[in-house]
Amino acid sequence: MKVLYGILIIFILCSMFYLSQEVVIGQRCYRSPDCYSACKKLVGKATGKCTNGRCDC
């Protein structure tokens, strides 16, 4: 049972590391499509979202 908890903790830590690879840029936005061109230049992918008036790539 302890092995299961150990594997679960490792999985959660790895997931948190992978999910925190977003890049917050200083461009102001009002909706997500405003971020697509800036994220394409910065990261290479046109995926981004507008969070609290800032672009997250």
Swiss-Prot record:
Disulfide bonds join C29-C50, C35-C55, C39-C57. Residues 1-20 form the signal peptide. Coiled coil: none annotated. Keywords: Calcium-activated potassium channel impairing toxin, Disulfide bond, Ion channel impairing toxin, Neurotoxin, Potassium channel impairing toxin, Secreted, Signal, Toxin, Voltage-gated potassium channel impairing toxin, Voltage-gated sodium channel impairing toxin. GO terms for molecular function: ion channel inhibitor activity; potassium channel regulator activity; sodium channel regulator activity; toxin activity. It comes from the Eukaryota. It is found in: Secreted. InterPro entries: Scorpion_toxin-like_sf, Scorpion_toxinS_K_inh. Residues 21-22 form a propeptide. Blocker for small-conductance calcium-activated potassium channels KCa2.2/KCNN2 (Kd=80 nM) and KCa2.3/KCNN3 (Kd=197 nM) and ERG1/Kv11.1/KCNH2 potassium channels (53% inhibition at 5 uM). Has also been shown to inhibit Kv1.1/KCNA1 and Nav1.7/SCN9A with a moderate potency, as well as Kv11.1/KCNH2/ERG1 and Kv1.2/KCNA2 with a low potency. This is Potassium channel toxin alpha-KTx 4.2. It comes from Tityus serrulatus (Brazilian scorpion).
